[in-house]
Every structure is written in C-alpha cells, then in structure tokens.
Design a protein with these regions (language model features):
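Class I SAM-dependent methyltransferase Rossmann-like catalytic core
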Residues: 1-36, 47-55, 67-78, 83
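Class I S-adenosyl-L-methionine
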Residues: 192-238
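A short glycine-rich, Lys/Arg-flanked "PGG" loop and its adjoining helix->strand segment in the class I
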Residues: 165-180
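Conserved SAM-binding strand-loop segment of SAM-dependent methyltransferases
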Residues: 127-139
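A short acidic, Gly/Pro-enriched loop at the edge of an enzyme's catalytic core
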Residues: 137-150
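A short SAM/SAH-binding and catalytic strip from SAM-dependent methyltransferases
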Residues: 147-164
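Class I S-adenosyl-L-methionine-dependent methyltransferase module
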Residues: 54, 58-129
Length: 238
C-alpha cells in the first residue's frame, strides 16, 4: 500500500488552484453557471471565486484561512507553493502530467493563481462579500443558499486525519447549504495513501437513506494517480 502513497502531508495544506483547474476537475460548464450561486468549500488561496465573479457567477468561498489578513496569507502562500512543488517533484513519476506538462509549469500556474486570489482578497469590499472564515462541518451560510457546492482536495483526501463521522457531518452540511435540485461535487475521492476512501460506500448508503442520490462522474483533470472520478450528490427538489 505504501507504494501508492503519492504525497506526504501533515496538517491541511493551502491550495492555490485556478479557474480552469476547477472547470476540469468538476467538469463545469461556465456559461451555464452565469447568474448561479456557487460555493467553494476549503477554497484556500485558489482563484476560482475571483475569476468566477468576473464571469458573472455569484461565487463565494469558505476556508478557515480567511481569519487571516491579506499580508499574512501572502507570506504563507508563497512558502506553501515551494513546499508543494518540492514534495511533488520527488514523486513526479506517479502523476499524470497531460495538463500541467511538468513541475515547472505547475509552479508558474500556482503562482499566477495565488496572485489572482491575493488581489481579490486584498480588496476590503470583495473580501467581506465573498470570503467567509469558516470550516466544515459547520458553515455560516443559510440553508438552501447555493445552486452548486464544490469541495476540492479536502474531504476523503485527508481521511487519515478526519474520521467517517466527521465526513458524514461535513457532507450533510454541504447538502444543507445547497438548494433543492442543486448539486454537491467533491474531488478527489482518494486518500493520500492512494486508496479510495474506505468508508465512502457506507457514507453514501447513509445519505441514500436520507433521500440523497449520488453518482460518480469522470473528471477531466486526473492528475493524481487513480483519481478518475468526482462525486456528485443530488439534493432532492421540493
């Protein structure tokens, strides 16, 4: 099993992904999201919310990181990118580089994404409107608030740190803030050990008893070894 471990991580990392990565990860159709309300959970320093807003998508982001000010995050972000690339390079043979081509280009994409986020976050009005200092399994958002809820590189991936009860509460919370008829999408479905999150079938069975339907859909950014699918949870319409 250890040979499948594709990344070493202590604590929860700060992410710095861009809009196109989200489009590919979750197979999004940006034009269909115009005017829709979208929540990015565990967004970190990703630029999805900034770019989505420019595309007339009502995007919001939630992460405990936002308890910090812009200058604090800026220092942490650049350090995190360097650590991430160094650890990734050690096991570069395990990844699918079709999109990123190699660590050097990936680093440049991360830096550009972080700069885009930082510029948006540094604007006081934008920061207050779009970025909530919050973490699962309890969010400050209203029930039935968002058409689409995204959770990237947190649930399941950190399954060695957060147990199944946490995951069940977190998934219920994502569904709570999702509008009836809306969707929750989660990617990837693997732990850092390279295995499908072991308790995922049991979690989905419990949600099914609560009226939630789930399906696996193919991702268009299968960078992590074995990460071919993302999970979609459908909230039943009234």
């Amino acid at each position: 099993m250890e040979t499948k471990r594709f990344y070493e991580q202590t604590g929860v990392a700060m992410t710095c992904r861009n809009f196109e990565e989200y489009v590919r990860m979750f197979d999004l159709e940006p034009e269909k999201l115009r005017g829709k309300r979208v929540l990015d959970i565990g967004a970190g320093a990703s630029a999805f919310t900034a770019e989505a807003s420019r595309r007339e998508i009502e995007a919001r982001a939630a992460d405990p990181l936002y308890a910090m000010g812009p200058s604090e995050i800026e220092g942490l972000g650049l350090e995190e990118i360097d650590r991430f690339i160094a650890k990734l390079t050690e096991r570069r043979h395990m990844y699918n580089w079709d999109f990123y081509e190699g660590p050097e280009l990936l680093k440049e994409l991360r830096k550009k994404s972080f700069a885009d986020f930082a510029a948006d976050y540094a604007n006081p009005a934008s920061r207050e409107e779009k970025y909530a200092a919050a973490s699962l399994p309890e969010l400050p958002h209203s029930e039935d608030e968002f058409d689409l809820v995204l959770c990237s590189h947190f649930l399941f991936l950190y399954g060695e740190q957060f147990g199944p009860e946490f995951h069940l509460r977190a998934m219920r919370e994502l569904l709570r803030v999702c509008k009836p008829g809306g969707e929750v999408r989660i990617y990837p479905l693997l732990t850092f050990g390279g295995e499908l999150y072991p308790q995922l079938p049991e979690l989905l069975a419990e949600l099914a008893r609560e009226g939630v339907t789930a399906e696996y859909r193919p991702t268009r950014l299968a960078f992590i070894p074995g990460s071919r699918d993302y999970l979609t949870l459908h909230k039943v319409a009234d």
